[in-house]
Swiss-Prot record:
The keyword Membrane applies. Residues 258-279 have a biased composition (Acidic residues). Residues 1-71, 135-170, 258-294 are annotated as: Disordered. GO terms for cellular component: fungal-type vacuole; fungal-type vacuole membrane; vacuolar membrane. One of its GO terms (biological process) is amino acid transmembrane export from vacuole. It comes from the Eukaryota. PANTHER family: AMINO ACID TRANSPORTER (PTHR22950), VACUOLAR AMINO ACID TRANSPORTER 3 (PTHR22950:SF530). Keywords: Amino-acid transport, Membrane, Phosphoprotein, Transmembrane, Transmembrane helix, Transport, Vacuole. This is Vacuolar amino acid transporter 3.
Amino acid sequence: MNGKEVSSGSGRTQSNNNKKNNNGGSTGISHASGSPLTDGNGGNSNGNSRSRSRSRKSSGTTGGLLKKPPLLVNNEAVHASVPDASHTSCNNGTLEVSINNPEPHVVDAVARHLIRNPSNSLQLQGGDITRDLYKWTNDHPSSPSQYQYPSQPALSTSIPSQAPSFSNRKRSMSFSAASIASSSHLNNNSEANGNPLAAIGLAPAPMTHEEIRAPGGFRRSFIIQKRRKHNVDAPIPNFFTRNFIEFLTLYGHFAGEDLSEEEEEEEETEEEPEEEALETESTQLVSREHGRHPHKSSTVKAVLLLLKSFVGTGVLFLPKAFHNGGWGFSALCLLSCALISYGCFVSLITTKDKVGVDGYGDMGRILYGPKMKFAILSSIALSQIGFSAAYTVFTATNLQVFSENFFHLKPGSISLATYIFAQVLIFVPLSLTRNIAKLSGTALIADLFILLGLVYVYVYSIYYIAVNGVASDTMLMFNKADWSLFIGTAIFTFEGIGLLIPIQESMKHPKHFRPSLSAVMCIVAVIFISCGLLCYAAFGSDVKTVVLLNFPQDTSYTLTVQLLYALAILLSTPLQLFPAIRILENWTFPSNASGKYNPKVKWLKNYFRCAIVVLTSILAWVGANDLDKFVSLVGSFACIPLIYIYPPLLHYKASILSGTSRARLLLDLIVIVFGVAVMAYTSWQTIKMWSQ
């Protein structure tokens, strides 16, 4: 049908092919195939000529795209402009169509491209698509000063003669938040000017219907509605809040294991609308694996996270540990532990990169089988329970001394066991928290109190030495009787191995992890050695297991620090217990047992968590009378395997598979033998001294 025109006025049929269809199925009409539409005189209107290029991509028939602009005509206009004809004919390639008695298939084909109502362009085929495209083009010219088309695409037969030229725009412009900002600005102005909806307590519409019909408008409207629903302004989290939430999230992936659960996601969506308000129109529709954060940490932030993970309560046990080992042996042992620990930490990260998995236990499963994974996770759970029990005794001891001095109670009037089990009332509600980020407030307070306590320990120890001098008469360079107790306490102090993998994963530049870790280990070694040596030099053999008890108990400064430090450890204990609870919970309950939709399963898990808290308190009560020996046993039996046995074992197996040098393999074997020997000897010695 190419090259044919629709005309009228001839009154006769000149072709035998008047009933043939074109290839696309639009029968007998050349409008869909590319030839111009003319009026009764066979001429093409100037308006149609201009609009041809604009409408070429607008819509199409069944056989192809619509090549010509639609005709804005009605029935009266058709009958007025076309003479009477009773038949169709074809002469010299021209098809004549009768208006009074047209062929049915011709009427059907023409009707597809006629707009009965000029204000409704959706009657066109594909109009629901081209409408938004035209509108977006009209609303986004190459410059603001250029001509703006009407809000609806120009679908009439006349197009303005002077059309502005549009430069090619990047696709990112379609994600511009200008429409949202302008809509919010208009809504705010309308409210200020006495919006009738606001007057009756109804919020104005976040977006107009034209903005919603724009590409991506529905998603933008949905995001704004969620903001309005929860009345959230979506402020940018401040530095401390953002960093502490990220730090707490690392405990959800302790030792690289995924310890989060489905209930956590449910609580985030139902009880934390602030997270929803942080969504934008460019936020991905389907989130990544829960718990994984797309935002990477800088090197400085990684250093701060490492410092937080290593510097904790264990530093206050070091003065008594220096007395057990002797100041010379203790300083040398701490320095050696820092060096060997750094090598084992690097071996663990190297093995993770070689094996290609993130979990500490998963590395053991791939290299040695499921029994190795069970051993690793058992050590993690046991060490975290040991930390929590030691923290419980530490808190109970400080609270007992504080109460006796502040309330002038008789010493021993309230037993230490009472303070231990009273903490269960606080630990149980906190342990039931599924979303670990909700502990951000308690963790922030705890870290601030710990920092204040450390500053006070340094300041008062220096002041005490300046006034009374060094207690050199009672200081020992090497304590032959109790030196093995120091090793377990020193290992207990380096308690941050579980956070190494998630911190390394969160770094924007993972290649900077080694130098960052080396710098942190140097800083930590200086803090540990200086604190232990300084307090031991100040108090000598009279140093207490908790060094705060050596400070004058009749001053408000000491009482305040004791209370704040006790509260700090009290609030941070549930955070230490969280990985152990999740590991034991995963072993006890089936993988598909979720309390998200089953209240019975959820309450069974709640009872299980309460049982773990009570068990930890009982363990703390057992070791309360000899806290230094209890801490040493936890460090020897639970922490030494995690640092000095499992990492070289994993690295040895992975290095054999990758072809590492024999010298490096021999070094791994030496560290393994050293770790096993130290663990066995120190654990046996600690139990022996405890029994005596």
